[in-house]
Regions:
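Cofactor-binding loops of NAD(P)H-dependent oxidoreductases
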Residues: 55
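A hydrophobic C-terminal alpha-helical subdomain
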Residues: 22, 216-217, 240-241, 252-301
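Short, conserved active-site loop motifs that form the nucleotide-linked donor/cofactor pocket
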Residues: 49-50, 156
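Oxidoreductase cofactor-interface core, primarily capturing Rossmann-like NAD(P)-dependent enzymes
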Residues: 2-44, 58-61, 65-72, 78-93, ...
């Protein structure tokens, strides 16, 4: 077995953390790129046996140093904020490109990047030209994907996870902004079907790709753990919680008034375009998946 480590970005967050844990469970060494090794989150992953290296995705030289000797890189970026409080999607692209180019300069043979469902395909939709709130986000994700495809790695894989099951946690104040008693709040329509994904399944998919680079070479996996409508989701949550819930059927204005975060408006695109991820895509590759009801019973029951 290759004893070289995998450089994991975002290891103190959700997707990177899930990937680090999945790799460790497979006896694959993990090196995490962190900006500050003295934070509680960094210390927590170090306690699992993760090697910490200090760097910044805006500093390509630090990326090259961090990637030296790695067998693979796991890549995830989220936009920061500009000085006026807007999402910094240009910065997200810059980080992704720096990581790709830094890994190439360091001679890393494999690159596994997690993006988002439907990124790139959105440009082909007949209604895309109407303008949608999710436009800049999908544009940033697509730009990083395009750069990876032509970067020249010996092996590369794109993971395109769907709608996080974790968005249903009341602590997120996202789909339950008023708590469970306040019901589901969203612009998603009752018949809209979501390609749901549990965050640990993203880690499992990344670890599977890293363990078998040749099999996953060039794979662009639309990753879903389950594919359910909002009505079906409400039925599952009702069973688990023992509280009757109905799928919302709200306008954007009504949803915002009920507490939906502004970024929830981006979900209007899902009502129009749907989500391409299906569980069978991952199952065909041997990736273990988490059913939504099982997830809900573990986290909400």
């Amino acid at each position: 077995m290759d004893s070289a480590p995998v450089l994991v970005t975002g290891a103190t967050g959700k997707q990177g953390g899930a990937t680090a844990r999945a790799l460790l469970a497979a006896d694959i060494a993990v090196r995490a790129l962190v900006r500050d090794p003295d934070t509680d989150r960094a210390k927590a992953i170090a306690a699992l046996g993760v090697e910490l290296v200090t760097g910044d995705l805006h500093d390509r030289d630090s990326v090259i140093r961090a990637a030296a000797g790695a067998r693979a890189v796991f890549s995830v970026q989220m936009p920061g904020f500009t000085s006026d409080g807007d999402f910094d999607f240009d910065g997200e692209v810059a980080q992704g490109v720096n990581l790709i180019e830094g890994a190439r300069a360091a001679g890393v043979p494999q690159f596994v990047h997690t993006s988002v469902t439907g990124a790139g395909q959105h440009l082909e939709h007949p209604r895309w030209s109407e303008g949608w709130a999710v436009g800049r986000s999908l544009g940033a994700k697509t730009a990083i994907q395009d750069h990876l495809r032509t970067a020249g790695f010996a092996h590369w894989t794109l993971l395109k996870p769907g709608f996080f099951m974790e968005n249903f946690l009341p602590s997120m104040a996202f789909l339950f902004p008023r708590g469970l008693a306040g019901g589901l709040v969203s612009v998603l329509k009752p018949t809209t079907r979501l390609s749901l994904v549990a965050v640990p399944d993203i880690g499992a998919a990344a670890a599977s790709a890293i363990a078998d680079p040749a099999r996953f070479d060039g794979v662009e996996l639309e990753l879903a753990s389950e594919y359910l409508s909002m009505t079906q989701i409400a039925e599952v949550l009702s069973r688990v919680l023992g509280t009757p819930l109905t799928a919302p059927n709200l306008t954007e204005e009504a949803a915002l008034a009920a507490g939906m975060p502004q970024m929830g408006a981006t979900h209007e695109w899902m009502n129009v375009a749907g989500m391409p991820g299906r569980p069978e895509f991952a199952r065909d590759l041997g990736i273990p998946l988490t059913g939504f009801e099982d997830w809900a019973r573990e986290h909400l029951g």
